[in-house]
Amino acid sequence: MSQAFTESVKTSLGPNATPRAKKLIASLVQHVHDFARENHLTTEDWLWGVDFINRIGQMSDSRRNEGILVCDIIGLETLVDALTNESEQSNHTSSAILGPFYLPDSPVYPNGGSIVQKAIPTDVKCFVRGKVTDTEGKPLGGAQLEVWQCNSAGFYSQQADHDGPEFNLRGTFITDDEGNYSFECLRPTSYPIPYDGPAGDLLKIMDRHPNRPSHIHWRVSHPGYHTLITQIYDAECPYTNNDSVYAVKDDIIVHFEKVDNKDKDLVGKVEYKLDYDISLATESSIQEARAAAKARQDAEIKL
């Protein structure tokens, strides 16, 4: 069918639809219709897609978000993350995808505390410390850091195969007046994302592996600053250069160091250590970048 048909669908939204809804739905309709025409979709193709979408919903529950997994596999979450966190302040810590395993309200621990409520024999403990600052290096006291990770078997606390408490390997920490934080965790491990559902089927169609590199998740917030959602990646992990969800960025690849006799406070407690500083962009810089991007987009539409 012609572009005239597509235009009739795009302009059919009622007067109470918000401007943002009109913009997004019209754009979605245009791209979906173009996709169908470009690939000459058949009814069989369309039904396969409908079933795929249905299975995403059926596979999802409070412990698993299959929709996020599918978006990750096609790189959509990484793209949206980049657009969301665009800023003129180039020296802030890079963001990364949230992923499907975030849980709010993790336990608050004092600095130096451990998020390891229950360990398994293959877990390797690590101590992480650093400072949270603004992009000029000013310490940000009172910043909130939420961290979470999987165990060495590759399972997060809400997954059925994770043998541990609900908030195992999750915790919240508050920086001191000088912006310092510290906590005990595990040296991260790589793992395959769940591939027993439609996300896994899509990976097989794409002839891709399901493995994510070793990483720790972070969510860092402070009043007046843009909330940073990111991950740090182990430089020694073979999947750091071949992430199944395309989320790795060069400046959030880190090197874990072996604890030695110079680290008297850590010897006998953990095997590895990491010093890692975080820099937050102001919320205003993010909003200014978004406004500039929107202005550029509007100008392109008028051309």
From Swiss-Prot:
Q: Does the keyword Metal-binding apply?
A: yes
Q: In which pathway does it act?
A: Aromatic compound metabolism; beta-ketoadipate pathway; 5-oxo-4,5-dihydro-2-furylacetate from catechol: step 1/3
> Regarding temperature, what does the record state about activity?
Optimum temperature is 25 degrees Celsius. Stable at temperatures lower than 40 degrees Celsius.
Activity profile over pH? Optimum pH is 8.0. Active from pH 7.0 to 9.0.
Q: Name one GO molecular function term.
A: oxidoreductase activity, acting on single donors with incorporation of molecular oxygen, incorporation of two atoms of oxygen
SUPFAM superfamilies xref list: Aromatic compound dioxygenase
**Which protein family is it in?**
Belongs to the intradiol ring-cleavage dioxygenase family.
Q: What is this protein called?
A: Catechol 1,2-dioxygenase
Query: Which organism does this sequence originate in?
Result: Candida albicans (strain SC5314 / ATCC MYA-2876) (Yeast)
Q: Which gene encodes it?
A: HQD2
